[in-house]
Every structure is written in structure tokens, then in C-alpha cells.
Amino acid sequence: MKRMIALDGAQGEGGGQILRSALSLPMITGQPFTITGIRAGRAKPGLLRQHLTAVKAAAEICRATVEGAELGSQRLVFRPGTVRGGDYRFAIGSAGSCTLVLQTVLPALWFADGPSRVEVSGGTDNPSAPPADFIRRVLEPLLARIGVHQQTTLLRHGFYPAGGGVVATEVSPVASFNSLQLGERGNIVQMRGEVLLAGVPRHVAEREIATLAGSFSLHEQNIHNLPRDQGPGNTVSLEVESENITERFFVVGEKRVSAEVVAAQLVKEVKRYLASPAAVGEYLADQLVLPMALAGAGEFTVAHPSCHLQTNIAVVERFLPVRFSLIETDGVTRVSIE
């Protein structure tokens, strides 16, 4: 019988990242775990609908036995079984992030007995989680280099707080993992600005695009009007395609916040990324830790190692026989497998 791993949910930033990482890993390794103090660092601690959906999805996919899977629970015991490929559907029941649920369970399906499809309904454009286009256009091309073949499709948008969106991913078992090397970003090839609108006047998007164009030379400027029943909502994105990597940044519009202020927040974030020669942005760095650990080799550079990144590394090192090295030189941190 494998040893139970005990985790402290207050570790790092005390949010949901440690729980998501902890759920992904035992599905792969077969090691049970217990976690206490779930989301202890948040104003409303314990499991929210999004986290509970991730727990139930993980349990269904690997036939786990679970204790503490209920709203508000701050303690969870998870004993995994065998991962099974198949066609899965999960509903969050709120505007909680579809992509965060997908990112919890998809790594386990890289080791399944056959191809799978996972569909999640909930929020797709959430200020605290990556939109599906980030997964599709940024993360999945990098996963393909590592040897992971999955394809995410956005079936319907669902903005916060209403939700109602649907995202699906098709994934195949991995034959072998490759080392990812992302030491340098390379020269910029092009930049693309994009605005999504649902039940919001078009002039909002035009002002947002104008703000982006005032700071960057945009090769593309796209405005997409979605059906009103998918809103109200507004997301502004800017994609930076470089020689070695494509990064994508976004800001979700808010009520009583002007179009110019929303777009200016995005401009600030992109300028911060471009000010450093690091290849990887802060959020993408979090997502590369687990696949790189499974490959057993690789490296990337990031300007600022976030608390999320360091929490993710700490959890991965509890479950897998790997050690990460973080070396800072001239304002850039090189993250690699020792």
C-alpha cells in the first residue's frame, strides 16, 4: 500500500492551485493524499463549486474514493484508482473556470488506456483563470513539442458571473515525452489584438483596440460579436508571436470600468513581459511544471517566479522523483530539472 502524502492547503498563496496540482499527480502516480486548510488564504476558504467539480471529475476518471468532497470543505482525502479513458462531461453549475477543471484532469488522461474527450460547462471568460484560447493557442503547441497531443475547442462562451459556457478537449495517451527547451523568446514576429463582445456596444471594442494600437504595432485587429445570450461580457486579448514561443495575455472587462482602463491594464501586462528577455510569461510558467517533470528534463526562463509557480513545484516534488532548479541571472529566472 502506497504511503499517504499529507499536504497543507495554506502553503504558498493558500489558494486553489495546490489542490489542483495535488489532484493531478496521484491520478498519475497512484499515491493517496490528504490536504487540510484548503484555500486557507482566501476570504471564503474551502471548496467552491469549481474546486468541487475538479475533485469529482478526478474521482470519476480514476475511480478514486474521496472523503470531504462537499462545498466549503477544508479537508480532503483522495485515494486514486486506475485512470480510464472515455467520454466525460462535468458541469460546474456556476461561472467557475472550465479551463482550470480541464487542466486538473487532462494530465492523468495522458496515461489512460485510450483516447478521451472531456467536456466542462461553466465559465470561459473569468478574470482569475486562462481563457480557452490561451490553452489552444499557447499551451497546447508547447505540449505538442513535449509529446502531448490534445485539442481544446470552445463550444460556447460563458462570462462571469453568469457562466453557461462550454469547453471540450480531446486527448490521446502519450507515447513518449520530449524535453522542452525555452531559454529564449527570440525576435517578435507579430502581435495580434482581439476583443470579444457579448451584449456590449461595439464602440467599447473599438476603443479597446485603439488603446492597444496606441502602444503596439498590431498586425491584426479583430473584434468578435458573440450572441447576446452569451453575455453580457467583454474580453480583450493581445497575442505576442515570437520566433520560439507564442504568448497570449488577456483582461476581462468589468462594469463601470472604462474601455480605455481595461485595455491599459493589458498594455501594462504585455509591456512587463516584453521588458524582460524571458521566454515564458508568469501564468504559462505554472502550466509547464508538471509536463516538464513528467518528461524528466527541460528548462524555461521567466521574469518573475510567482508564488503559484513555486507552490506548483513544491507539490510536484512531493509526488515525483524530480528536483527543480531556479537560478536568477540579470533579472531572469531559469527554471530547469536538476
Curated annotation (Swiss-Prot):
| Keyword Metal-binding on entry | no
Q: Which UniProt keywords apply?
A: ATP-binding, Cytoplasm, Ligase, Nucleotide-binding
| SUPFAM superfamilies with a match to the protein in the record | EPT/RTPC-like, RNA 3'-terminal phosphate cyclase, RPTC, insert domain
Its recorded reaction(s) are: a 3'-end 3'-phospho-ribonucleotide-RNA + ATP = a 3'-end 2',3'-cyclophospho-ribonucleotide-RNA + AMP + diphosphate
* Annotated PROSITE patterns: RTC
> Which GO molecular function terms does the record list?
ATP binding; RNA-3'-phosphate cyclase activity
Q: What is its EC number?
A: 6.5.1.4
Q: What does this protein do?
A: Catalyzes the conversion of 3'-phosphate to a 2',3'-cyclic phosphodiester at the end of RNA. The mechanism of action of the enzyme occurs in 3 steps: (A) adenylation of the enzyme by ATP; (B) transfer of adenylate to an RNA-N3'P to produce RNA-N3'PP5'A; (C) and attack of the adjacent 2'-hydroxyl on the 3'-phosphorus in the diester linkage to produce the cyclic end product. The biological role of this enzyme is unknown but it is likely to function in some aspects of cellular RNA processing.
Descriptive protein name: RNA 3'-terminal phosphate cyclase
What is the source species? Escherichia coli O6:H1 (strain CFT073 / ATCC 700928 / UPEC)
Taxonomic lineage of the native organism:
Bacteria, Pseudomonadati, Pseudomonadota, Gammaproteobacteria, Enterobacterales
Q: Its encoding gene is what?
A: rtcA
